Amino acid sequence: MKKKVLSVLLVAAMAMSMLTGCGSKPAGNDAQSAASSEASKETEAAAETPASAEDETLTVWCWDPNFNVYAMKQAEKAYQVDHPNFKLDIQEKVYSDIETALITAAEAGDYSTLPDIFLMQDYSFHKNATNYPGIFTALDDCGIDFSQFSMGKLADSTVDGTHYGIPFDNGATIMAIRSDMVEAAGLKVEDFKDTTWSEFMELSKKVMAATDVPMLTCSGGSEIVIEMLQSAGASPMVDGKVSLVDNKALKKAIETYKQLIDEGIMADYTDWDQYIASMNKGTAAGVIQGCWIMSSIQAAEDQAGKWAIVNMPKLDDVEGATNYANCGGASWAVSSNCKNTDLAFDFLNATFGADVDLYDDLLVNAGAIASYLPAAQSETYNEGNEFYGGQAVYKDIVEFAGHVPGIDYGAYYSDIRSALTDAITNVVQKNADIDTEIKNAQDTVEFNIAE
């Protein structure tokens, strides 16, 4: 895929020099006068420099040099245009090490080891903000217009109405489908847009008859069930209590998943490499996943022009159901140890909270799709992508993100997902009763919470 930068960040390199006095040594009675003059110059120089370079340095923890670290380096350059003394000390750490350091600091009651800014997985915010609130600086007064981000993404880092994260990468759910396989069945890509799951299944059967491959591939049933749940805006936690039993959307999602498997419409792989291979080798006609899966799809260069992106199907007969969900991603947080919150707020506001040019650069050079909604209006985001038949896929994905409902997992996302994985496995492999398995899942989560 050809990549074209349509906007360039112009970074002005500014340096400050200090006069150190290189003239000849003053003689006799002129020495005191010269010393006084030199002291005066130093005082004036200090007065002209309101803050040292060190005072304008922020420390950042994040992972992945080609993605998150790159994003911070580009944000630093962008901010330096108007703030030449500004610097970032970016420390690359794997996420597990970041979370361990955060929890260790919180349990010791000593936050002095924390950086000014850190990146956190979205699904970790509720858990950490609930259990270790002292880690964070609240962002409600940081100046960022949070309405310009996806509501579904914001919900992950908003706890009890308080914002703790600034959304970064986009995890909007997409349905990527093989346009050539769809056309072989006498259908069009447009037929798969804005469908219900029952409509999707009928279309899929036609594609399967024409191609002899499953319509979808997946890896781990709980993920797609959770995406279905979010697409209906149905929270698994309500008012701090587990809400799996009598959750109509959840039951419908599990029923839908079972039907997809039973009718051979979707193949479920436990091995991740086999899952990716099913896309790259053409043994499945599509996939529903967070938009980050696109890099894996695009690894099969021989399939360029044979893929398209549409939104996911919505649950039938569920009030509030939509065609949109989110899967994965991370957001920037400011720690309670931040030495200069005004500077951190201004930096984040001016870059990740407003800079469309920055988001253009990150898309082209790092493959980072914005969750900042105005980014979809740029020329870069509206440019057709040859791999997807000339479709302006990035604009579409940001627009998808703008429709994602927010739901509440509380501090127990991992517990809920684990319990649902067991429930779904029993329903599909043992034909277990769905209501019973949902009740067992709720009991399991409640037991874990009570411990």
Language model feature labels by segment:
Residues 1-59, 81, 436-439, 443-451:
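Short, low-complexity disordered leader/linker segments with a strong preference
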Residues 45-49, 119-174, 201-203, 209, ...:
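Hinge/lid segment of periplasmic solute-binding proteins
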Residues 54-65, 86-91, 116-117, 164, ...:
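Short, well-ordered beta-strand elements
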Residues 78-149, 184-186, 283-286, 300-301:
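Extracytoplasmic "Venus flytrap"/periplasmic binding protein-like
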Residues 81, 140, 144, 157-223, ...:
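Helix-loop-helix "hinge/cap" segment bordering the ligand-binding cleft or interdomain interface
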Residues 96-100, 233-306, 310-315, 342, ...:
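Extracytoplasmic ligand-binding clamshell segments of periplasmic binding protein
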Residues 126-128, 293-304, 316-419:
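C-terminal lobe and pocket-closing loops
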Residues 137-149, 192-193, 234-252, 259-260, ...:
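Short, solvent-exposed loop/beta-turn-alpha elements that line the ligand-binding surface or hinge
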